[in-house]
Amino acid sequence: MVMQFQGLENPIQISPHCSCTPSGFFMEMMSMKPAKGVLTEQVAGPLGQNLEVEPYSQYSNVQFPQVQPQISSSSYYSNLGFYPQQPEEWYSPGIYELRRMPAETLYQGETEVAEMPVTKKPRMGASAGRIKGDELCVVCGDRASGYHYNALTCEGCKGFFRRSITKNAVYKCKNGGNCVMDMYMRRKCQECRLRKCKEMGMLAECMYTGLLTEIQCKSKRLRKNVKQHADQTVNEDSEGRDLRQVTSTTKSCREKTELTPDQQTLLHFIMDSYNKQRMPQEITNKILKEEFSAEENFLILTEMATNHVQVLVEFTKKLPGFQTLDHEDQIALLKGSAVEAMFLRSAEIFNKKLPSGHSDLLEERIRNSGISDEYITPMFSFYKSIGELKMTQEEYALLTAIVILSPDRQYIKDREAVEKLQEPLLDVLQKLCKIHQPENPQHFACLLGRLTELRTFNHHHAEMLMSWRVNDHKFTPLLCEIWDVQ
C-alpha cells in the first residue's frame, strides 16, 4: 500500500459535514509552508502480537522510514529564542494538511510495570512488587504475591480487581453488603469482594497498561521525596531543634517551591498560547439554547469536536521545542493525544466555562444525541472528578501540554527528545501544585492520576467511532483525518 501526500497551494474550505471516504486532505502539521511534491511511504509489517490490541486498532499494518532527528542537547528552556513565533496568517479555519499514520492503540498487553503501586511501600525493592516471607492478602487472607494496584494482595484478588474495573462490572450482594471477606466468601460475593479491594487501597488508575509511564514514576519519586523530607523534619523536631531552626527549614522549603525565571518564562509562554486558542463560545452555547433532535445534536457535537482539533493543532504548534522534533514524531504526538486533549479541554469547559446551572442541561442534551450511556457515563464521571480537584487554568494548560508531549505514544522514534520537552512542564506543574495547594501535598499526584483515567477514553472513543460508522454518521474531513476514519 502506498500513501501519497500532496501539498495544497490554497486552503480548502471544508463543508460542515461530509462522508468520510478516503480524502486528499492531510495536515502538514508543524510546517510553516504547505507541503510540496509527493511523498510515498511503504506500509508493511504487523502492528503487534498482542491479540487484545486488534479489536480496537484502526490499522493493522504500518512501518515508517527511519529518520534520525537532530536534537540539541542544550537546555530547551534557557531563553526566549527557543520559543516559536508563528505568523497570524498560518491559522485557517478550513482544513489542515496532515500525513496519515495509524492512531495510537491503547492496550498493549499487561506487564509487571502496570502492577506497580502508585504509593510505593518501604518494603518494596526493584522487584516491582515482589515480597519476602508469607505475608497475607489484605482482601481475602490468602498468601499474598506482591503489591498489586497499590495493595498487598494475592494473585486471585489482583485478577478479580482487574477484570471488575476493566469491564465496569456491577455486582449485587445477596446479604445486604455485610459479607465478611475470606478465602471462602471471596468466591461467593463479588460485590463485597470488590468493595474490600477498594477499602484496602486498590486503585483503578493503576489498571491500564502503559499508564504507569515515566510521568507516574516521577510522581512516585516525588511523593517519596516529600515523605522522606517530612520524616526528616519530624526527626529534627524530636531531637529538640529550636524554633529558629525549624522556621529556617520551613523557609528554605518554601523558597524551593518558587518558580525559577526560566520556569516563569515557560509558564507565561504556555499560558499565552493556551489563552489564544479558545473554543468559540457560540458553539458551546448552541447546544444549550434549545432542544434539538438526536441528529442535530450529533451535528453540533461534531462541530465542537472539529473546533477542539483546530485549537489543539494551534496550541501544539506553539509548544516550546515541539518543532525541533522529527516530523513523523510530531504527527504521532498530535494524533495520539487528540482524544485525551479534547476530553481534558471539555472537562475545563464543563467545570469552568458553562453558565451557572447548565452542566446538567449539557449532559441531558449529549445523552439525547444518540451516544450510548456506556460511553457518556464515564465521560461525565471524569468531568466531575476533574471539577473536584479545583484546577486552575495554569494547571489545565500544563496538563494539556504534558498529555501532548507523552513519550510513550506509539510510533515515536525519539522518545528521549520528547521526554526532554515534557520534563520541564512536569517540574513547573509540581511547583505550582505546592504553591496553589500547600495544604494538599497529594494534589500533584491526583492530577497525574487523572492522566491515567484519560487514557481509557482512547478505548471508549474507538468503540464509539465503530458504532457511529455502523450507523453511517458523517464527520468533517478534519475529524476523519485526525481520528483515522475511513
Swiss-Prot record:
Alphabetized Pfam families for the sequence: Hormone_recep, zf-C4
Gene Ontology terms: cellular component: chromatin; cytosol; euchromatin; nuclear speck; nucleoplasm; nucleus; receptor complex; RNA polymerase II transcription regulator complex
A GO term, aspect molecular function: DNA-binding transcription activator activity, RNA polymerase II-specific
UniProt entry keywords in alphabetical sequence: Acetylation, Activator, Disease variant, DNA-binding, Immunity, Inflammatory response, Innate immunity, Intrahepatic cholestasis, Isopeptide bond, Metal-binding, Methylation, Nucleus, Phosphoprotein, Receptor, Repressor, Transcription, Transcription regulation, Ubl conjugation, Zinc, Zinc-finger
N6-acetyllysine: modified positions: K167, K227
Effect recorded for K132R: Decreases transcriptional activation SLC51A/OSTA, SLC51B/OSTB and ABCB11/BSEP, no effect on interaction with RXRA and SETD7
Phosphothreonine: residues bearing it: T456
InterPro entries named in the record: NHR-like_dom_sf, NR_LBD_NR1H4, Nucl_hrmn_rcpt_lig-bd, Nuclear_hormone_rcpt_NR1, Nuclear_hrmn_rcpt, ThyrH_rcpt, Znf_hrmn_rcpt, Znf_NHR/GATA
Sites where the protein binds chenodeoxycholate: R345, Y375, Y383, H461
Modified residues (Phosphoserine): S145, S164
Family matches, as Gene3D superfamilies: Erythroid Transcription Factor GATA-1, subunit A (3.30.50.10), Retinoid X Receptor (1.10.565.10)
UniProt DNA-binding residue ranges: 134-209
Effect of substituting K474R: Decreases transcriptional activation SLC51A/OSTA, SLC51B/OSTB and ABCB11/BSEP, no effect on interaction with RXRA and impairs interaction with SETD7
Additional information: Ursodeoxycholic acid (UDCA), a natural agonist of FXR, is approved to treat primary biliary cirrhosis. However, effects are discussed controversial. UDCA is also used to dissolve (cholesterol) gallstones as alternative to surgery.
PANTHER family assigned to the protein according to its UniProt record, in alphabetical order: BILE ACID RECEPTOR (PTHR24082:SF155), NUCLEAR HORMONE RECEPTOR (PTHR24082)
Physiological role: Ligand-activated transcription factor. Receptor for bile acids (BAs) such as chenodeoxycholic acid (CDCA), lithocholic acid, deoxycholic acid (DCA) and allocholic acid (ACA). Plays a essential role in BA homeostasis through the regulation of genes involved in BA synthesis, conjugation and enterohepatic circulation. Also regulates lipid and glucose homeostasis and is involved innate immune response.
Protein name: Bile acid receptor
Native organism: Homo sapiens
